[in-house]
Amino acid sequence: DGWPVRIIAKGDYPMKVFVAGSKNISSLNSEVQRRLSSICEKGYSILVGDCYGVDSQVQEFCFHNNYLDVSVYANNGLPRNNIGAWPVKTIIVTASVKDFEFYSKKDAAMCRDADYGYMVWDGRSKGTLRNIADLAEQGKMTLIYLSPIHKTVHVQSKEELEKLIAVCPAETRALYSKIELQPTQISLFD
């Protein structure tokens, strides 16, 4: 099903999967729900943000399936959504950081903390593409559900991501070029 099998040794921790996606995706189809069920069945920890769209839909899925191993990441400890009243991972962000960069701090923390990624992407979301790029930079496997074509692909390196971007529409290639020009959101001092 695309997920690595890992035997959890005594004193080890469950795999952490950063699950995120586009804000304009308001429901999860059966394929995405099947993948989420697989994550839950394997006992992986789910790291999710507090935004509307895919974040809140993943929270709804976990809540309705009584899945408890969820951490909600929120800037300054104030989640916009926490449907299951799960533990909140606070990401401190100064008042001088605004807009996209404000929310990307939380995403950077989830990229850093996760072992794997699962992204539900509309092919246009800058934030989701930034997460995929950051996970690839760290050599972390990411399953990407491409909602426009209903297909799942694997990416684990910048080279694999660039091959994917090369077959995307011009709009997506331009978006990736913009992201590549920005410094990575990962910092040793975050």
Q: What is the predicted function of each stretch?
A:
Residues 1-14:
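Short, Lys/Arg-enriched N-terminal segments with co-localized hydrophobic residues
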Residues 25-181:
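Acidic/glycine-enriched connector segments
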Residues 15-23, 49:
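Short, hydrophobic/glycine-enriched beta-strand segments
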